[in-house]
A protein has these predicted regions:
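Solvent-exposed loop and beta-edge segments used for protein-protein assembly and interaction
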Residues: 1, 85, 120, 153, ...
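Generic detector of well-ordered alpha-helical segments enriched in charged/polar residues
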Residues: 111, 174-177, 181, 267-275
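Eukaryotic C-terminal
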Residues: 158-160, 172-202
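Accessory C-terminal segments flanking Radical SAM cores
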Residues: 190-278
Length: 278
């Protein structure tokens, strides 16, 4: 195990979608149980004592990560971002982006996360799934258009459109690219599979990227006995390690090795997981 570690917090299994390929067993029939903010605070605090110092880039995922807004908990994500920033981390929020079609919800979410980014002087990133599995192009276009045409949002939010290494994902990304061009956004194709989309004369932008360097394996919903359906490397560079802490009091290393936390210190949990690797 090398010395690069990324932290990820899975805040819920609830999702408004039920995608056939979902590796997290997420759907709208799951109980909307959220990782408590008290536990998030505890994990972030203890992360500073881990034997491997985590990268400052962390992620929040689900289910649908913005689900708290749909269950009358509009302060959840802003407080989670406050905690992440206060411990010196830079957050990425993974989402399916379908909330972009709800005008009131879209404006609320974008303003909330932008206000936190401005407060701490660091960007917040949205990772939005754009592939053959998510019918979300309309909502995604509205999120992008709002972000890049609003000064406060443009300088606070970075958006990554994330796809798989499949022809369907390539088609979805190309379709998004063409629609963005019709909206008047400049696109600089810097290297194969990745585009950076910038509002004219603005320094902030959007990255369209293929998130996985390898093809998808074992497409299909995860089995109850299998934590994760592998889709390639974990977050970060090749060989990096990802420690995910979820809403069911489990720690998962590299989407493979699973360990109950059971009120143990996080450094002890990571030690147990590292023993499983070896």
């Amino acid at each position: 195990m090398n010395n690069e570690l990324y932290l990820s917090f899975k805040i819920t299994n609830w999702c408004n979608l039920h995608c056939d390929h979902c590796c997290e067993r997420s759907n709208k029939h799951n109980e909307p149980k959220f990782l408590s903010l008290e536990k998030l605070d505890k994990y972030l605090s203890e992360s500073k004592t881990l034997p491997i110092i985590p990268n400052q880039l962390i992620s929040f995922s689900g289910g649908e990560t913005f689900a708290p807004y749909m269950f009358n908990q509009p302060n959840y994500i802003p407080v989670a971002l406050d905690l992440a920033y206060s411990y010196g981390y830079i957050p990425t929020i993974k989402t399916n982006g379908t909330w972009g079609d709800n005008d009131l919800l879209r404006i609320k979410i974008l303003n909330d996360i932008a206000s936190r980014a401005h407060k701490y002087g660091k960007l917040v990133t949205l990772d939005i799934s754009v592939d053959e599995f998510h019918n979300n192009e309309s909502g995604v276009m509205k999120i992008i258009s709002n972000t890049l045409t609003n000064f406060d949002l443009c300088y606070a939010i970075r958006i990554c459109l994330v796809g798989f290494n499949t022809p369907g994902s390539a088609n979805a990304l190309n379709s998004s690219q063409q629609k963005l061009q019709t909206l008047g956004f400049e696109i600089d194709k810097t290297y194969s599979g990745d585009w950076m989309i910038c509002a004219p004369n603005q320094s902030c932008g959007i990255y369209m990227c293929n998130d996985y360097a390898t093809p998808i394996y074992n497409i299909g919903r995860a089995k109850q006995t299998k934590t994760y359906t592998s889709t390639g490397n974990p977050n970060g560079n090749d060989g990096a390690n990802c420690l995910q802490l979820d809403n069911n009091d489990y720690a998962i290393l590299n989407y493979t090795y699973r360990e109950p936390i059971k009120n143990r210190p996080l450094n002890k949990v990571l030690e147990s997981l590292m023993e499983k690797v070896h």
